[in-house]
Amino acid sequence: MDSINIMEKFSLFNEQWTPKIIGELNGQYVKICKLKDAFVWHSHENEDELFMVFKGTLLMDFRDGRTVRVSEGEVLIVPKGVEHRPHTNGEIVFNLLFEPKSTLHTGNVEIPLTVKKLNWI
């Protein structure tokens, strides 16, 4: 059992929208990912999704027309079943996620960016 330097882990990869696992607890993975520009509209039928921004500003669009701004040090929890689309204003955002191990980052949508086997770093 060792501490994890999250910012150091972010320095180990450049891919965007490709979560990396840095830990697990209680049937969930602790994941980090870099986000830039717009992702796909999607939802997670059985899982809530927690976004915690370490660097930059994440914007989360919802189908009701709202956009929620998530700044450094802030958290947004998207309830299961709620369609959402994360995006940025062109900057690379460092994000941490807590999700059940079975959660696909693209939720109910399969696209070329869908990663079914996540890597540990």
Predicted regions and their residues:
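Short acidic/polar mixed-charge low-complexity motifs
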Residues: 28-29, 58, 66, 82
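Short beta-strand His + acidic residue motifs that chelate non-heme Fe in jelly-roll/DSBH
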Residues: 41-42, 60-61, 78, 83-89, ...
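Double-stranded beta-helix
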Residues: 2-10, 23, 85, 89-121
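A cytosolic small-molecule/anion-sensing beta-strand core signal
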Residues: 26, 54-55, 71-72
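Short, conserved beta-strand element in jelly-roll/cupin
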Residues: 34-35, 44-63
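Short, surface-exposed charged micro-motifs
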Residues: 21, 50, 59, 67, ...
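Short acidic-glycine-tyrosine-enriched beta hairpin
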Residues: 64-80
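A short glycine-rich, His/Asp/Glu-containing loop-to-beta-strand
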Residues: 6-41, 47, 107
